[in-house]
């Protein structure tokens, strides 16, 4: 689960099916490999020829003299089983299968599926690609049939060759360049986009990740990877398949929770590429300068929720209120007005609209604006027939779309720093045992869930909230307003309740909404509850429930809170504390706990001097992804925290990092060791192979605890003031025990038998 794929930049590449035949896949790919300055070694494998492209070729993998780290397989699917077995035998860690899958016969697809099925447990990482395949421009690697991409900072994961071609064209126009292109054939590839998202997130050369949504892979794992990546760099999710109104609402909800930018059309994708590539330049207000009347542009801006501001203090004619400075301004005059606007304190961003002219004035203005764009720190959007570069467009509407994308992304980043308020005191938690007693008695089931009265809804309700199971994303709660459809996803938090109340105008019903979402966290874990509808009419709020005892379980896109119930633990001094998972609604208590710690202890825990957690740190600590993170807390009967421990993914594949704090009153009482045991167990369940942390050399108590728990302590390779603690989480193998007493006991038992 926590493995990253082999890097797509090999040192020694084996090309199986390399060819000189015209119009063949092997010929096209070998040409692409040889025309770029690839610094690695290329070895062709061809059954019939001793040389290919002037290079020595081998008849099969068994005859290769040198070890290789990637095999590029260009032969038909009928060869896959034999080739993959040979890769396993030769210890080649990564096999990339490239085909024009759209042109293959059904039997060839079946052969590919069967070969992949047989090799699913092998140690060979298999990636199935469409003809655009893999490109790493900075390394000169192009394993596909498409033109070489310019080097840059955008990592691309596409699911079809046509998407790769479109994204390549958009990249060429926008100009940010590509760090890595991965063209996966989504229906077949065992190595999925989530694997490569993890890789690109850790890649320092990649500053933006643009990924085409893969509906074929596990959605929980996919959006967990996107969420981790979006904490480090911008992520664009391009939705190439048809998404109906409900799925769009779900993807918007995922965007709010994970922090990625969704795009549902090619135009939205192009605008988002510009916006996210210039993500450090954001603004709320947009001024405009134009050499043509632009009043109609405000109509388009209104649809996007943008207000265009005219040039400040420019003495423009009152009849041209939208930045029109005349139809034939000299280029220097246009530039002077634009620079004056950018230097004005009220200007946050400027849109320069340059209409075609009979002479070369428009081209000259565009060049001047391009140079000015490089010199200013404020966003300068350029619309011109001569546009070519980042934040440059051929139509003003495209620039408006990019400006909107910047604002949306800024809002998404701010949402990632929000924390949930504590649960309201009036909430009641349903009992799963009571729910399971009444699957057929719907009125009683509504009572067990603390829902409004079970009753047939009115014909024209004031609002309708619908809970149901999406085939791809699991449990979803929808709210339909006259403007759009909203969705929120479990585990539901008070942040979701507030979002629903605010966006759907349900302030009068906020108590009902809070209880509903709290109850639905329980209902989401009960498969036979397939649907719940809550509506409000003149007679009050009612609920309707649909059940199906035979319903199949659909995994929710977000992992639920740990199923392990809260338990009590007795300290050495006899005090009893409650141990439970940390929830998003614990943010306020978490902050109070950090504030209560002595200054020195806060420093040893966070390795910085702070009085409290920043909003970003607090949100990061409390808004956990329980598919790859975990946290537990210890609290007294009155809710006072005595300790907290957490873990999350590290940069090293298969490794997680931990952190722990205990209040002074609980130190030396066995609590820290117990909390560590809880998160170690959860990390094992999530599939991690190692748990680690860097501990200050001046913190002997933490080093002693780590040693007691089995962590190996070594000096940190990064900082002499730190020690690195690492615990192997892998289950011990069944090896003979080197223990005289144990062995003697086993011999006696054997003799008695």
Q: Model-predicted segments: where are they?
A:
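Catalytic-core regions of core metabolic enzymes
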Residues: 1-544, 551
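Long, contiguous binding/interaction regions
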Residues: 548-753
């Amino acid at each position: 689960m926590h493995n990253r794929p082999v890097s797509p930049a090999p040192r020694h590449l084996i090309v199986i099916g390399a060819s000189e035949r015209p119009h063949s896949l092997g010929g096209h790919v070998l040409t692409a490999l040889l025309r770029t300055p690839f610094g690695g070694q290329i070895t062709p494998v061809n059954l019939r020829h001793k040389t290919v492209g002037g290079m020595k070729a081998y008849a099969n993998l068994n005859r290769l003299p040198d070890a290789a780290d990637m095999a590029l397989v260009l032969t038909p699917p009928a060869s896959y089983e034999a080739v993959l077995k040979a890769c396993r035998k030769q210890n080649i860690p990564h096999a990339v299968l490239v085909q024009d899958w759209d042109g293959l016969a059904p039997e060839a697809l079946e052969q590919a599926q069967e070969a992949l099925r047989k090799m699913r447990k092998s140690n060979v990482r298999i990636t199935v690609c469409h003809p655009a395949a893999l490109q790493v421009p900075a390394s000169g690697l192009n394993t596909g049939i498409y033109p070489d991409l310019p080097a840059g900072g955008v990592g691309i994961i596409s699911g079809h060759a046509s998407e790769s071609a479109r994204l390549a064209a958009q990249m060429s126009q926008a100009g940010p360049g590509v760090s890595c292109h991965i063209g996966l054939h989504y229906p077949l590839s065992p190595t999925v986009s989530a694997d490569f998202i993890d890789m690109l997130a850790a890649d320092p050369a990649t500053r933006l990740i643009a990924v085409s949504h893969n509906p074929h892979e596990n959605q929980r794992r996919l959006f967990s990877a996107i969420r981790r990546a979006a904490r480090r760099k911008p992520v664009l999710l391009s939705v190439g398949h048809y998404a109906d109104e409900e799925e769009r609402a779900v993807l918007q909800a995922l965007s709010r929770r994970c922090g990625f930018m969704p795009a549902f059309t090619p135009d939205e994708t192009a605008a988002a590429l510009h916006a996210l590539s210039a993500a450090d330049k954001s603004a709320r207000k947009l001024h405009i300068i134009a050499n043509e009347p632009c009043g109609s542009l405000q109509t388009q801006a209104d649809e996007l929720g943008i207000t265009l501001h005219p040039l400040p203090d420019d003495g423009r004619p009152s009849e041209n209120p939208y930045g029109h400075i005349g139809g034939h301004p000299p280029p220097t005059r246009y530039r002077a007005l634009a620079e004056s606007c950018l230097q004005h304190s009220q200007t946050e961003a400027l849109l320069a609209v340059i209409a075609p002219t009979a002479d070369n004035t428009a081209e000259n203005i565009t060049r001047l604006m391009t140079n000015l764009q490089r010199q200013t720190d404020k966003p300068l959007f350029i619309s011109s027939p001569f546009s070519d570069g980042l934040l440059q467009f051929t139509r003003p509407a495209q620039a408006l779309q990019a400006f909107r994308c910047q604002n949306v992304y800024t809002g998404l980043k701010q949402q990632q720093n929000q924390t949930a308020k504590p649960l309201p005191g009036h909430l009641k938690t349903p009992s799963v045992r009571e729910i399971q007693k009444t699957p057929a008695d719907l009125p009683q089931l509504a009572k067990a869930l603390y829902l409004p009265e079970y009753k047939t809804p009115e014909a024209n309700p004031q609002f309708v909230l619908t809970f149901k199971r999406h085939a791809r994303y699991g449990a979803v709660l929808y709210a339909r307003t006259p403007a759009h459809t909203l969705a929120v996803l479990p585990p539901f938090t008070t942040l979701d309740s507030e979002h629903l109340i605010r966006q759907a105008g349900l302030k009068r019903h906020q108590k009902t909404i809070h209880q509903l979402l709290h109850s639905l966290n329980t209902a989401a874990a009960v498969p036979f509850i397939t649907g719940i509808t809550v509506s409000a009419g003149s007679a009050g709020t009612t609920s309707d429930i649909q059940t199906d005892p035979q319903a199949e379980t659909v995994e929710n896109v977000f992992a639920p809170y740990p199923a392990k119930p809260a338990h009590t633990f007795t300290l050495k001094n006899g005090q009893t504390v409650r141990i439970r998972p940390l929830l998003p609604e614990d943010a306020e208590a978490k902050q109070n706990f950090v504030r209560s710690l002595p200054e020195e202890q806060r420093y040893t825990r966070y390795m910085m001097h702070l009085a409290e957690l920043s909003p970003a740190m607090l949100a990061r600590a409390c808004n956990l992804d329980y598919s790859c993170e975990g946290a537990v807390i210890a609290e007294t009967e009155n809710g006072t925290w005595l300790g907290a421990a957490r873990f999350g993914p590290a940069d090293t594949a298969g490794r997680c990092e931990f952190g722990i704090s205990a209040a002074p009153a609980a130190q030396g009482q066995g609590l820290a060791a117990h909390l560590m045991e809880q998160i170690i167990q959860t990390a094992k369940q999530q599939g991690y192979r190692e748990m680690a942390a860097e501990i200050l050399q001046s913190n002997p108590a933490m080093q002693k605890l780590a040693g007691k728990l089995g962590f190996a302590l070594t000096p940190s390779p990064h900082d002499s003031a730190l020690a690195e603690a690492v615990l192997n989480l892998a289950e011990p193998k069944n090896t003979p025990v080197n223990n005289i007493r144990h062995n003697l006991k086993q011999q006696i038992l054997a003799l008695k038998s």
